[in-house]
Amino acid sequence: MARDARKRTSSNFPQLPPAPDDYPTFPDTSTWPVVFPELPAAPYGGPCRPPQHTSKAAAPRIPADRLPNHVAIVMDGNGRWATQRGLARTEGHKMGEAVVIDIACGAIELGIKWLSLYAFSTENWKRSPEEVRFLMGFNRDVVRRRRDTLKKLGVRIRWVGSRPRLWRSVINELAVAEEMTKSNDVITINYCVNYGGRTEITEATREIAREVAAGRLNPERITESTIARHLQRPDIPDVDLFLRTSGEQRSSNFMLWQAAYAEYIFQDKLWPDYDRRDLWAACEEYASRTRRFGSA
């Protein structure tokens, strides 16, 4: 691998340069679990370049000042994808696993620095006990199965969500992945499990109320910044681009505080059919928009 293989093309265009034609491509996603290709060792112990898309398409050139810094995705459509094929809903979730890794690769190629993925919401506990049990075990196993690969790519993995009801084994695997990747800085992936925007704001409000009751905080001095500091991950930047797959047009209680001024793009593909080229297309549309943040 050339010394400058991961070097960005320009400070104004943060995309990775096109990969060499013989560089590994993302694996066939028709079987599960997908076997990730062996990547050439990175020079000087740095992160590996992601495998290129099977089409060998390169990330579009988008200037840094037009590129979303933080993309949040509601990964919707796994169940419908399976139902359309006469399969159990769990099969759709399985096929969505490879898409998560492909999207991470595409985000790295494009130069996105923050990616938040809605893996399990606080409302998903309402699903059948069988599906909930599957999703708990599945999320635990996905993190365990993919953390080494993501570490090699320079991904920092973090869990965002609430502890009540969440399986201890899931929390443990997320903690291991977070510790393993804490020094990585290519991209941060917030893996949101047992997450709800209203729950997050409620928890922040409860903690602020405790501080007021203890005399540590003057209620007259509470500001938006006060609330932001008490969110589950205070350092998460505001969402720039909010994506939802499957054609549904709603936020489903995801990143309510952080996405206050996000650009929303709803894409029709079901999550198992989605790939990095769809992410790139959404980012190109984002780049064409004018963000006013309430101004004229």
UniProtKB/Swiss-Prot annotation:
Q: Where does substrate bind?
A: 76-81, 89, 93, 121-125, 127, 168, 244, 250-252, 292-294
Region ranges (Disordered): 1-24
Task: Return the CDD domains for the record.
Answer: Cis_IPPS
**Database matches in SUPFAM superfamilies:** Undecaprenyl diphosphate synthase
Tell me which InterPro entries the record gives. Answer: UPP_synth-like, UPP_synth-like_CS, UPP_synth-like_sf
Q: Name one GO biological process term.
A: polyprenol biosynthetic process
Q: How is its activity regulated?
A: Activated by dithiothreitol and inhibited by EDTA.
Q: Residues in the active site? A: D76, N124
What catalytic reaction does the record list? Answer: (2Z,6E)-farnesyl diphosphate + 7 isopentenyl diphosphate = (2Z,6Z,10Z,14Z,18Z,22Z,26Z,30Z,34E)-decaprenyl diphosphate + 7 diphosphate; n isopentenyl diphosphate + (2E,6E)-farnesyl diphosphate = a di-trans,poly-cis-polyprenyl diphosphate + n diphosphate
Which amino acids does the record list as binding Mg(2+)? D76, E263
- Cofactor annotation remark: Binds 2 magnesium ions per subunit. Can also use manganese as divalent cation, however calcium and zinc ions are much less effective.
Subcellular location, record wording = Cell membrane
One Pfam annotation, family name?
Prenyltransf
Q: Any idea of its EC number?
A: 2.5.1.86, 2.5.1.87
Q: What domain of life?
A: Bacteria
* Entry keywords, A to Z: Cell membrane, Magnesium, Membrane, Metal-binding, Transferase
- Please list the cofactors this protein needs: Mg(2+); Mn(2+)
List the GO cellular component terms: cytosol; plasma membrane
Regarding pH, the record states: Optimum pH is between 7.5 and 8.5.
The record's function comment reads: Catalyzes the sequential condensation of isopentenyl diphosphate (IPP) in the cis configuration with (2Z,6E)-farnesyl diphosphate (Z-FPP or EZ-FPP) generating the 50 carbon product trans,polycis-decaprenyl diphosphate. When (2E,6E)-farnesyl diphosphate (E-FPP or EE-FPP) is used in vitro, both primary products decaprenyl diphosphate and (2E,6E,10E)-geranylgeranyl diphosphate (EEE-GGPP) are synthesized. M.tuberculosis does not synthesize (2E,6E,10Z)-geranylgeranyl diphosphate (EEZ-GGPP) and heptaprenyl diphosphate.
State the protein's name. Answer: Decaprenyl diphosphate synthase
What organism does this protein naturally occur in? Mycobacterium tuberculosis (strain ATCC 25618 / H37Rv)
Q: Which gene encodes it?
A: uppS
